[in-house]
């Protein structure tokens, strides 16, 4: 019961059934071309979390451009980063539910300039609200060839309104305060 209380305090919600039962399903494919609901039907308790690829308009392949066009339903993408396709896919995935949650690591470019005007209005119009956000921070990894980018993390939900949380950083390479 204590664990459930801590989960509720930190996330604002805890699943009814703890411990969580393992159900491994591995699907190999292009996440932007797969129908997510056919793999895992959305429920009001489903959470989508991810760290999709960061690819700006000058660094994606023709296939990735086609993925982005398919998900957004337009060839007029402006400067939308490839990662925005996962925001749109998450929005589409939860269309049949009244609730849902998703959080994604993205390049900080999605929170500035013309990408803001293209990405966020459709989310807000569909009833999504910003639940939490991490301000820009430097991506760190011990992996060989790790991305050298500045990131944000944004979390969205359709739940009852509560004040959104902002995780601020005094330095991009620091810890949130």
What are these regions (language model features)?
Residues 1-177:
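Signature of N6-adenine DNA methyltransferases within the class I
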